[in-house]
């Protein structure tokens, strides 16, 4: 009896098996490490380093100053959000008469292009 079992065990690849004949990857799932590796993140990048930088204005200044008043940039963009077309129109309204001729012409061309673009394509139609 033992010799028959050994014979069957030796040529088991010839006998039909009750399991899959193909592999789905790693057979032993106990050996797979499912714990992800920790990410190396920069804790002092621009976004994280400036988080909460204006919180002391409200605490020390009795909430009289708004952080948008402290942002340095073009005055037609301070504390204002919008798309490129709205930004160009706002710039033309506020500094248009003081611009050089070629800069104003380039701005007008850009406004014309964006106006056509926004009216022909996209979710703005």
From Swiss-Prot:
Subcellular location: Mitochondrion
Interval spanned by the transit peptide: 1-29
Record key words, sorted: Mitochondrion, Ribonucleoprotein, Ribosomal protein, Transit peptide
Protein name, entry field: Large ribosomal subunit protein mL51
Family recorded in the similarity comment: Belongs to the mitochondrion-specific ribosomal protein mL51 family.
GO cellular component: mitochondrial large ribosomal subunit
TM helices/strands, residue ranges: none
């Amino acid at each position: 009896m033992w010799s028959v079992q050994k014979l069957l065990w030796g040529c088991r690849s010839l006998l039909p098996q009750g399991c899959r004949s193909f592999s789905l990857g790693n057979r032993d799932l106990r050996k797979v490490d499912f714990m992800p590796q920790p990410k190396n993140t920069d804790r002092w990048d621009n976004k994280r380093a400036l988080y909460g930088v204006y919180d002391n204005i409200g605490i020390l200044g009795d909430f009289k100053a708004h952080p948008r008043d402290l942002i340095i940039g073009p005055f037609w963009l301070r504390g204002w959000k919008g798309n490129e077309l709205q930004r160009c129109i706002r710039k033309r309204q506020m500094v248009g008469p003081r611009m050089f001729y070629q800069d104003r012409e380039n701005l007008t061309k850009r406004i014309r292009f964006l106006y056509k673009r926004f009216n022909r394509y996209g979710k703005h139609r």
